[in-house]
Amino acid sequence: MIAQHAVFPETQHDERARYNFIANLNKHLAHVSQGNSMAFEKRAEPAFKAEHGRTFASKEELQQAMEQDPHYQTWSALRRSTMEMRQQAGRSLPYRQAQELRQRVAAINKVSDSLILNDKVSVPAYLLAVDNHLMPGSYHTEQFAGDVANAANYDGGLFVTTAGLLGKYSDSYKE
């Protein structure tokens, strides 16, 4: 179960149901992904060796070989779909609460000096050019001063994307 900290967006029943569905689908796909090893060992690698008389010379060759495999194609398409579903399900939560979230963050930051941002640092072009994790505007976009909606969207979605594997606060990563 996901935990809610002080600036986590409030959710309604249907939103939680959508999140739970996507989290469980991602959990299932984590098991399905294990078949990619078999697809590589049984089909992609032998086919490549038969055609080229050698093993892979680069990760690009390996990627091209795997992209031809039906199991990998199915897993990849489903994984992409869950990312799109996650964005559709999650974006409305922080956006309908954007002003309230901004106020909560401002109140916390007012009494804490734990985060100091440098206004002179600009987002690099390579980050501006891409919507990371399919999130429109990525992590850096502000619709108004102090906007934290995209950060809140990412925060809530991380639990769903990882199917809770990072813990209830998404802070349990272990190498």
State what each model feature region is.
Residues Q143-N153, L158-E175:
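Conserved SAM-binding loop and adjacent beta-strand
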Residues I2-V148:
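N-terminal auxiliary segments of SAM/dcSAM-dependent transferases
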